[in-house]
Structures are given as C-alpha cells and as structure tokens.
Curated annotation (Swiss-Prot):
It catalyses: (3Z)-phycoerythrobilin + oxidized 2[4Fe-4S]-[ferredoxin] = 15,16-dihydrobiliverdin + reduced 2[4Fe-4S]-[ferredoxin] + 2 H(+). It is an enzyme of class 1 (oxidoreductase). This is Phycoerythrobilin:ferredoxin oxidoreductase. Belongs to the HY2 family. Catalyzes the two-electron reduction of the C2 and C3(1) diene system of 15,16-dihydrobiliverdin. One of its GO terms (molecular function) is cobalt ion binding. InterPro entries: Ferredoxin-dep_bilin_Rdtase (IPR009249), Phycoerythrobilin_Fdx_Rdtase (IPR022827). Pfam families: Fe_bilin_red. PANTHER family: PHYTOCHROMOBILIN:FERREDOXIN OXIDOREDUCTASE, CHLOROPLASTIC (PTHR34557:SF1). Keywords: Oxidoreductase. It comes from Prochlorococcus marinus (strain MIT 9312).
Length: 253
C-alpha cells in the first residue's frame, strides 16, 4: 500500500503535513523509495482489553539515495490514544554529516517533541561554528513559543546536538496551535537546512569514514537496545512484532 493512500496522508492524522513535507522534499533530491517488507509497510491491529478494543494503524516508509543517503525512514502510528511520527535519515558515511532525527509522539495526556541534527561523532568533529550558530538560532526561535522540556540524562544527551528542539506539551487546543504553526515551521527549516548541507557535503578521507561508520553503529545499537518507544509499541502490536520492527527495520541500514 502506498503511504499516500493511507490514513497518514489525511487531515485527521495529526502529523500529515509533516509527513507530506518529508516525502515531497526527499523526492526533489531524486531519492528512491525503498521497498519495506509488507508486514512492516502497513499494519492494522487492535489493542486494549476485550471490552474496549481499539484500532491502531502503522505504516513504515523509506527511501535511499545512490550517493548521499543509506536509509531514510518514517514510522507512522495512528490510534485513539497515540499518534506518532518517527523519522530518521542515516547519511552515507563518505560524508561527515549527522543524522536527522524526528520524534513527534502524542500520548494520552501529552505531546513529546524532539527534532535535531543528531551527532554520530563528537560535536566539534562534525559541526562547524556556522552550522551550530544557525541551528541554535532556529532552536531558540522555536523555544520562544514552545516550552523546553526537562533536561535529558547524560546517557541520552550525548546523542543530541546543542540545536535540539525538545518540548513537552499538554493535550490542549493551545498545543495543537503551536504544533500546526511554530513546530511545523521549525521542522521545515531544520529539514531544508539538513538536506542542503547533506547534498553539498564533500567526500571525506577513509580514516574519517571509519570513524563515521563506528559512530553510526554505536548510535543504532544504542537505539536497538534502549529505544524508548519499545513499551508503547509492545502494548500496541505485541512484543514479537515490536522486536523485529526495531531490529530489522527501524535501526538498520
């Protein structure tokens, strides 16, 4: 099933505009859709007690680029209690470019929002001052409207840049307005800047490529072992499906 034919392209899914912007902009850079195994590309399921079963939909969509992107994938979830857009670009390791990471999660009582250029090396080895200044300026503008969430633990924070947008909003009308306006604007600014940098980057030497491979593998292994979405996914789709999704699709190249 094409992602365009699913509920995730319809206005009643909270993140539909974000997903459309991703798909359209990656196509402008001649990215090619990557075939996802059918059991992960679209899934309908139910969760909850026998007396109050709820429907949940999941779709996984991905692309590659012959030179620049190993794998870029979006995971979309829709249900009465949860609405999720998780997106990750894993760049080719011949370029010294961080990951692009999005995690927008609507829970029963709150929205958790993360947007960043996520490092695969130490910050000083992957970001020049110009990029950091641009990111921090965009971040500060976003957080002039969106509250900054509590400080991340050191173990988690090492996988984020100084430009990370990290917010927690209550489920209320004001939050819907902030998501549809300020967050959407910031999301477009971050993605546009990221793709510009990725597609203008020059190839690096073999030693640095090895460091980038190790850095990416460290992050992907950390996510496989510690993915915070695991409990939610397990409650919606069961443990067996969740483990195979995480290990075979979400954090692999």
């Amino acid at each position: 099933m094409l992602i365009e034919d699913t509920i995730f392209y319809r206005p009643d899914w909270k993140w539909h505009n974000f997903l459309k912007y991703l798909v359209n902009n990656l196509s402008k850079y001649n990215c090619l859709e990557k075939k996802i195994p059918s059991e992960y590309s679209y899934k309908d399921s139910t969760y909850g007690s026998k007396k109050s079963k709820k429907n949940v939909n999941l779709s996984t969509w991905g692309v590659t680029h012959k030179k620049r992107i190993q794998f870029a994938r979006a995971v979309c979830i829709n249900s009465p209690n949860y609405s999720v857009l998780n997106f990750l670009i894993i760049p080719n390791t011949i370029y010294n470019v961080p990951f692009f990471g999005v995690d927008f999660v609507s829970l029963p009582n709150s929205h958790l929002l993360v947007l960043d250029f996520q490092p695969s090396l130490k910050i000083q080895n992957q970001y020049n001052n110009e990029l950091l200044e641009k990111l921090i300026k965009l971040k500060n503008h976003c957080h002039s409207s969106l509250p900054l969430a509590e400080k991340m633990s050191a173990d988690v924070a090492r996988f984020f840049s100084p430009g990370v947008i990290w917010s927690k909003l209550p489920k209320e009308e004001r939050s819907d307005f902030l998501i549809a306006n300020q967050l959407y604007t910031s999301f477009k600014e971050y993605l546009d800047l990221y793709l510009e940098i990725l597609f203008e980057s020059q190839q690096v030497n073999l030693n640095l490529q090895k460091e980038l491979i190790n850095g990416q593998n460290n992050y992907l292994k950390y996510r496989i072992d510690n993915d915070p979405a695991r409990p939610m996914l397990s409650s919606l789709f069961g443990k067996e499906f969740t483990e195979s999704l995480i290990k075979e699709v979400l954090f692999t190249t």
